[in-house]
C-alpha cells in the first residue's frame, strides 16, 4: 500500500496536542520546512519537541516557538534563538539540555528498542544530577534513557511510494535516527518516485520505519551564518 499523502497539511493532522515530536535536521540543514509550516498553521499546542536545536527566530522550529506551541524542548544547542531565550527565562518553556552525542544515541536507542544505556559524557556535571551512576572498569558512567516520539518528521532528498528514503550529504544528519524513533514517521521529500526506482544500495532509511511521505519540492534554502571570502585584490566577496 502506498504511503504518499496529498500535502503537508494532511500530514500535520496526525499531530495532536501534547504529543512528543522528534524533528530531524541540524540547524537549518535538512529540516522538514513544509511540515513545520503546516504544524504551525494547524495550531497544535503543548508539544514536547526533540531536536538537535530549535531553529532560528523566524524559521524552522523557531516558528513553533514563536507561536507558543512548544511546552518542552529537548535539545543540545539553543543559542541561535532569542525567542527561545525569552520563553525559557520567563518560565514559559521547559528545557532539557542534552550533550549532542548523547542526544543522538538516546534517539537511536529509542528507535532500536533499547530502553537505556550508560555513558561517561556528563558525569560530574549538572547533566548527570538525579541519574543513576555505575562504575565499569574503574570509570563512572551515567544512565541515559532512550527517546521515542508520538510522531517523527524528517527531510529526505528522495523517497519512493513505500517510504524508502535517501538523504543528501550533510542534510542526512539527525534524520535517519529520528525516522526510527517515531511511532508515526512522516518524511518530507524533495522528490518522490515509484517503488523499485531507488537503488537498494543507496537507501539510508528503509520504508519499514516510515508511515507517510509528502512532497516538499519548493523549499526555501536558508543559511544560518553566511561567511564569504574577499576576492584577492578586488575587494569583492566571492
From Swiss-Prot:
Keywords: Transferase
Amino acids binding CoA: 24-30
Keyword Transferase: yes
InterPro entries with a match to the protein in the record: 3-oxoacid_CoA-transf_A, CoA_trans_fam_I, CoA_transf_BS, NagB/RpiA_transferase-like
Transferase keyword on record: yes
Gene3D superfamilies: Glutaconate Coenzyme A-transferase
EC class name: transferase
Record NCBIfam families: pcaI_scoA_fam (TIGR02429)
Family: Belongs to the 3-oxoacid CoA-transferase subunit A family.
Protein name (Swiss-Prot/TrEMBL): Probable succinyl-CoA:3-ketoacid coenzyme A transferase subunit A
Gene source species: Bacillus subtilis (strain 168)
Top-level taxonomy: Bacteria, Bacillati, Bacillota, Bacilli, Bacillales
Gene from which the chain derives: scoA
